């Protein structure tokens, strides 16, 4: 999702889609104690999910670096305490976690061990799990798909082997920990390809010769690795800009032999100065229907976020309410995941403070802080449909 910092920066076939939804598109750290419910890995009818990949670092800061964060606990108005209980009370039933190969931070946030720990907590809380492989040491998005530092010397064959090895390693660790993810992304917002330059699709001169075949090979290495560990997991190919017609991308991927079980989209309806949020929501709904109809599979909105400032709260809540009402009625949509809802618009991860980066805080969370407690706003209530 960090693409926000770089970009902040048909219906006639629907009947066919409904009848063919179950045909595979591909063809051929925390310090807070949560009180868990019974673990569950059953398919959810509709995912109201949250990507909380920053939660471990936030909880670490609450204990070890209090000057970096404006609160010491997650709690809601009903008395629920701990991030997962608060999210569950708000209606969240699934958790998404990103995976980096060799994270920059020495604490290893979003590395294998952190992801396994967070996934275990989610499963113990009775939530479904999505794993989001970036195949990078940092955010992979439309502005950057940087090959991990330890992989840069490999050619296509070698990179495919590293994708296989890394995917199996992380998923096998999850399996050993008793976690069975329902969904696995093989790449994050991969509209421009992945693992640049080998898997890059375009440059300033246009489409790169051989780019699609390379990208498909790398993506398929991830797909096959997922199926070798969790055969029933839905493998997602994820791109940005749900408001755009994205059929061209999946046409090209399919033509190159790419495999996927589900399509993933990002939707940030308040980030395009050329469109109103209502227009972006409407376009996203139409495109979800179109993609599902054309490729015979469900669509997951893997990321969503709206502005969290006090002056925007009312309209942001309305935006989320209207989108969730529309998308929930679609049998072709598998669910929606809010990106990092637990932040308050002030806290930011330490890696954002590097001198060559110096990024601001993420301003599309769904929590607020009174200086001691992080609690949900009306945005999370509208998104989850539960109490807060």
How does the language model describe each region?
Residues 1-12:
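Bacterial N-terminal signal peptides that target proteins for export
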Residues 2, 16-42:
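Bacterial Sec-dependent N-terminal signal peptides
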Residues 40-83:
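Boundary/entry segment of secreted carbohydrate-active catalytic domains
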Residues 48-52, 95-97, 129-133, 182-186, ...:
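Hydrophobic faces of well-ordered beta-strands that scaffold small-molecule active sites
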Residues 58-59, 70-78, 101-113, 191-194, ...:
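Acidic-and-aromatic substrate-binding clefts and catalytic sites of carbohydrate-active enzymes
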Residues 83-84, 232-234, 242-315, 325-328, ...:
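Glycoside hydrolase catalytic-domain groove-lining segments
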Residues 84-211, 215-234, 240:
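Substrate-binding cleft and catalytic face of glycoside hydrolase catalytic domains
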Residues 310-326, 330-388:
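Aromatic-rich peripheral "rim/lid" segments of glycoside hydrolase catalytic domains that contact
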């Amino acid at each position: 999702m960090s693409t926000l910092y770089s970009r902040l920066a048909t219906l006639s076939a629907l009947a066919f889609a409904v009848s063919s939804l179950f045909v595979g598109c591909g063809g051929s750290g925390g310090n807070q104690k949560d009180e868990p419910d019974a673990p569950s890995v059953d398919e959810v009818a509709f995912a109201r999910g949250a990507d909380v990949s920053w939660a471990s670092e936030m909880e670490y800061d609450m204990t070890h670096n209090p000057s970096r964060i404006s609160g010491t606990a997650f709690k809601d108005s009903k008395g629920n305490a701990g991030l997962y209980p608060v999210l569950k009370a708000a209606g969240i039933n699934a958790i998404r976690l990103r995976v980096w190969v060799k994270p920059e931070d020495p604490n290893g946030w979003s590395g294998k061990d952190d992801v396994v720990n967070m996934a275990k907590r989610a499963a113990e809380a009775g939530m479904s799990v999505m794993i989001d492989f970036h195949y990078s040491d940092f955010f992979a998005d439309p502005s950057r798909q940087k090959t991990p530092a330890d992989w840069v010397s490999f050619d296509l064959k070698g990179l495919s082997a590293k994708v296989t090895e890394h995917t199996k390693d992380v998923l096998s660790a999850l399996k050993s920990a008793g976690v069975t993810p329902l969904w696995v992304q093989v790449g994050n917002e991969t509209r421009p390809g992945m693992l640049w330059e080998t898997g890059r699709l375009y440059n300033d001169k246009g489409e790169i010769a051989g780019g699609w075949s390379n990208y498909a090979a790398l993506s398929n290495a991830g797909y096959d690795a997922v199926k070798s560990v969790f055969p029933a997991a839905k493998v997602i190919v994820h791109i940005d800009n749900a408001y755009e017609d994205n059929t061209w991308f999946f046409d090209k991927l399919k033509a190159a032999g790419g495999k996927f079980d589900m399509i993933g989209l990002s939707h940030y309806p308040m980030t395009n100065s050329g469109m109103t949020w209502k227009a972006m929501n409407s376009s996203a709904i139409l495109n979800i229907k179109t993609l599902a109809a054309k490729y015979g599979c469900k669509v997951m909105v893997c990321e969503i976020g709206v502005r969290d400032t006090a002056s925007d709260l009312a309209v942001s809540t309305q935006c989320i309410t209207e989108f969730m009402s529309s998308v929930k009625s679609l049998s072709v949509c598998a669910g929606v995941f809010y990106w990092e809802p637990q932040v308050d618009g002030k806290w930011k991860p330490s890696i954002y403070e590097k001198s060559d980066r110096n990024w601001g805080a993420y301003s599309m969370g769904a929590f607020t802080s009174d200086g001691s407690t992080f609690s949900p706003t009306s945005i999370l209530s509208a998104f989850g449909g539960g109490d807060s």
